[in-house]
Amino acid sequence: MNILVIGDSCDDVFVYGVIERMSPEAPVPVLQPTNKTSNGGMSKNVYNNLKALDVQTTLITNKEKIIKTRYVDEGYNQMVLRVDTNDKCRQIDEALRMNICNNQYQNKTYDAIVISDYCKGFLTKSYIESICKSNTNVFLDTKK
């Protein structure tokens, strides 16, 4: 099986730590970091999950690096803050979109296409519609 994944992606960063006091400067908790993890998020998460199942997978995603950093109190396992960096991305190239619509991206034919749209600007409604109309096995997950 050969699957094409298209969509917005990000790096999901989790900073875990301990909160023992409030800041004297403002009514906010002070987090002492103890651990940090990073994973692919959004369409990268779909791609990584398919790869883990030994599925041949290709990812088309944004070049701009979107980072979602979550700060978590490990004592209560509660997120206390999320910081988003570079939250938007450029649209997919028209020539690339036409190759996808013709199901011939990189001279490959795909058994299925997964569209993972998180509304960050990489895919437009018209791009999604044309990909869906031009291919039979399309799975769409959109936040719209």
Put a short name on every predicted segment.
Residues M1-A26, P33-K144:
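Ribokinase/PfkB-type carbohydrate-kinase core domain
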